[in-house]
Amino acid sequence: MKTRELQSCANRLEEFLVTMLASVGRSERRHHGSLYVQGLLLDGERKSIEPLAERLPGGNVQALQQFVGQSPWAWEPVRCLLAQHLQEELLPLAGWIIDDTGFPKQGQESVGVARQYSGTLGKVGNCQVAVGVHLTTESESMPLDWALYLPQAWTEDGERCRKAGIPEKTPFRTKIQLALELIDHLLAWKLSRQPVLADAGYGNNTEFRQGLADRQLHYVLGVESNTAVWEKPTQRVQPRPRAGRGRPRRPYYGGQPRALRDLATALPSEAWRTLTWRQGSQGPQRGRFAACRVQPAHGHVRDKPELEPVWLLMEWPSEAAAPTKYWFSNLPEGVSRRRLVRLAKLRWRVEQNYQQLKEELGLDHYEGRGWQGWHHHVTLVCLAYAFLLLERQRYKKTPIPTLPEARRCLQLVLIRMIGVCPTCHRPAVGRGSLTT
C-alpha cells in the first residue's frame, strides 16, 4: 500500500469505529472500544485481554478488562447499527443463517459452561455454546447477533447466575427458542426479510419451522433422512362414533408416512438432475438433486394438526450408494430447483465464518467469566470482522484477497494508527514510514 492508501484506510477504520461505538457512552469507553478492535485486528496468536494490551502502546490491562467485563454499555444498539449498515453495504442479500458454535473451556466458572455437545469439538466436552444469526450473500457472510445458551443446571442455580452477572430471573431457553429470538431481533431492527437457512439440528424441529412460517419467513432447512413425510396431502379422518359404551375413537390418518431415505431411493432416475450451484476455487461445484412436494408427518401419532406441504430437496452424489442430504423448504411452489439448491448450499459459509472469527480475531479467546463480558467481546469481534469484510468489498481486481489476507494487509494501517510496531514497540519511522 502507498502512504495515501494507508491513510485512507486508516481514516475509514477510524470513521467506522466512531460510528459503530457511538452508543457506548462517554469518550473513554469509545476510546477503549476502538483500541480493543484494533488489538483484535493486529497480528498475535492470542486475542485475550492481556496479550492484546501488550501489543497496544500504553495498553492498560485493567482499563480494557473493566471496559469489556464491567462497563455497563449495551451491546444490542451496537449490533443493531452494524446489522443495518451491513444490509446496505452487502448486496444482493441472500439469506439469514442460523447456527451454533462451541467455546471450549477449562473449569466450571465461565458463564454457561457445561459438559455438553459441541459441533466445534465434534463430541461432548466442557464448553460454552452460542447460537448465532448470520447475514449471507452469494459470496460473503457475517454474524449479526448472538445468544449464549444457558443449560438448565445454570438457570436453576440462582447463586451461580448471580455470580456470573446473568440478568435476574433469566429462564431456561432451548437453542430453538434462542434462534427464534434472534430472528425477532432482526425483524425488530427493520432488516429486510430473508430466507432462513440452517442445518438439521434446527430444520428437524417442527417448532422452529412453524415459528419461521408464523413470522412469514421462507426457509431452506436441513432435515434427517429418517424424517417421516406423506407424499400426498393427508388429513386426519374423524371416525364414526362408537356404538354403546367405551372410549371414544380417536382421529387417525389413512396410511403410513415414509422416511425420506425410502422416498428418495424409490424415485425414478429421471427425477435426478445435475446442477451447478457455484464456481469454487477448484472449479464448478455440482451435484445431483431431486425435488418434490411432501407433507411432513411430525407429530401425527400425537394427534397434532397437519403441517403444510413443503418442498423436499434431496442430494445424491454420483459416487454415493444412497442420497446423503435432505432439506425442507416453504418457498413458493413455483420456485426453481436451482434456487432451492443455491440457498441450501449457502449454509456452508457459516463454517468459514466461525473458523475465521476464531483463528483470525480470537472469538473464543475471551478469558473473562461473566455474562456481560462475553457479550461485549463477541460484539467487538463482530465489528473487527465486519470492517475486514467491507474492505474486501473495495477490491476491484481479482483474485479478491481472502479475509485472513485482508487482515494481514491491514497491519501497516494499524501500525500507522497506534504509532508503534506492536511487536518491538519502536516508533514506526524510517523506510516505509507511516508518519508522513
Q: Model regions: which residues?
A:
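Catalytic-loop motifs flanking and including active-site residues across diverse enzymes
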Residues: 129, 349, 353, 376-382
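Short amphipathic alpha-helical "interface-anchor" segments enriched in bulky aromatics
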Residues: 100-102, 202, 250-254, 334-368
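An anionic, glycine-rich sequence signature occurring as long contiguous blocks
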Residues: 14, 136-164, 168-172, 224, ...
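Conserved, well-structured functional cores that handle cations and Mg-NTP chemistry
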Residues: 2-197, 201-221, 225-228, 235, ...
